[in-house]
From Swiss-Prot:
It is found in: Endoplasmic reticulum membrane. Substrate binds at S190. Keywords: Endoplasmic reticulum, Membrane, NAD, NADP, Oxidoreductase, Signal. This is Dehydrogenase/reductase SDR family member 7. InterPro entries: NAD(P)-bd_dom_sf, Sc_DH/Rdtase_CS, SDR_fam, SDR_family_member_7. Residues 1-28 form the signal peptide. The gene is Dhrs7. Belongs to the short-chain dehydrogenases/reductases (SDR) family. It is an enzyme of class 1 (oxidoreductase). Its EC number is 1.1.1.-.
């Protein structure tokens, strides 16, 4: 082979590879590392069997679907949230798979804001199953209100629930994992923990706090390579998170039903989460475009992202004031993409 031909082939590859990556990105519903793991990585069916998994926020949405898909893998489940009746419903749904028995699922009601109860809850799990292999920090609430109209108590509640509660439970479970020198801490964050948006200032703050905390904690536990961390950043997913979101008062939530057809199906989000857990990925972004693209812009071009955020934010706020879905701009952009 002549040098001229070799150089020509190298130049052709240099042109084709970026084009292939661009096409992959345009079709992506997660970051490319996660999608590569989905294609070539380890399967959850191989890696996550025979484990004890504790899921908070398990009464609906991502937490419920995660419990359901984990039940198919034959794990022992601990289901926690405040609503005991809903947890029992989720338990029945998991048992319908036929892979688990009553003794394999522990319903453990838990209020993340009641940090004094976390130590006893952890002991209850260890007494029931003898170990905790995976803690999934999924509990939390969102927010839909303007900063100047929002009572300070709402911001306190968001920090106490989304951040302090998660930190507290993690601190209770970690000594057990350190003693065993193994375990997984999975934290369901949000794209809002990367790219801040209007009407969710307190929620964004709590999610940014989680990102900083778990990145720092990971570095502190470097001497325990068997303890791994996975921070999951979903975009819009079909769930009740907006319906249950705080508004300007702690006692008020959105409670209005909105169109969720443009959001990612919960089952797809959870499947990608399981793949990230099976492959020990440290940080994963799970979202359709244009939100996924927005996360990349925030990461690599923050000045431009801030300008774009202000432009879209005006429309979000106007829709909110008109009692419309604030996310209509993203819905429109996704419809154009589809």
């Amino acid at each position: 082979m002549s040098w001229e031909l070799l150089l020509w082939l190298l130049a052709l590859c240099a042109l084709i590879l970026p084009l292939v990556q661009l096409l992959r990105f345009l079709r992506a519903d997660a970051d490319l590392t996660l999608l590569w793991a989905e294609w070539q990585g380890r399967r959850p069916e191989w890696e996550l069997t025979d484990m004890v998994v504790w899921v908070t926020g398990a009464s609906s949405g991502i937490g419920e679907e995660l419990a359901f898909q984990l039940s198919k893998l034959g794990v022992s489940l601990v289901l926690s949230a405040r609503r005991a009746q809903e947890l029992e419903r989720v338990k029945r749904r998991c048992l319908e798979n036929g892979n688990l028995k009553e003794k394999d699922i522990l319903v453990l009601p838990l209020d993340l804001t009641d940090t004094s109860s976390h130590e006893a809850a952890t002991k209850a799990v260890l007494q029931e199953f003898g170990k905790i292999d995976i803690l999934v920090n999924n509990g939390g609430r969102s927010q839909r209100s303007l900063v100047l109209e929002t009572n300070l108590d709402v911001f306190k509640e968001l920090i106490n629930l989304n951040y302090i509660g998660t930190v507290s439970l993690t601190k209770c479970v970690l000594p057990h994992m350190i003693e065993r020198k193994q375990g997984k801490i999975v934290t369901v964050n949000s794209i809002a923990g990367i790219a801040s948006v209007s009407l969710s200032s307190g929620y964004c703050a709590s999610k940014h706090a989680l990102r900083g905390f778990f990145n720092a904690l990971h570095s502190e536990l470097g001497q325990y390579p068997g303890i791994t961390f996975c921070n999951v950043y979903p975009g819009p997913v079909q769930s009740d998170i907006v319906k249950n979101a705080f508004t300007e008062e702690v006692t008020k939530s959105m409670r209005n039903n909105i169109d969720q057809s443009y959001k990612m199906p919960t089952s797809r989000c959870v499947r990608l989460m399981l793949i990230s857990m099976a492959n020990d990925l440290k940080e994963v972004w799970i979202s359709d475009h244009p939100v996924l693209l927005g996360a990349y812009i925030w990461q690599y071009m923050p000045t431009w992202a801030a300008w774009l955020n202000c432009k879209l934010g005006k429309e979000r706020i106007q829709n909110f004031k008109n009692n419309l879905d604030p996310d209509l701009p993203y819905k429109f952009l996704k419809a154009k993409k589809d």
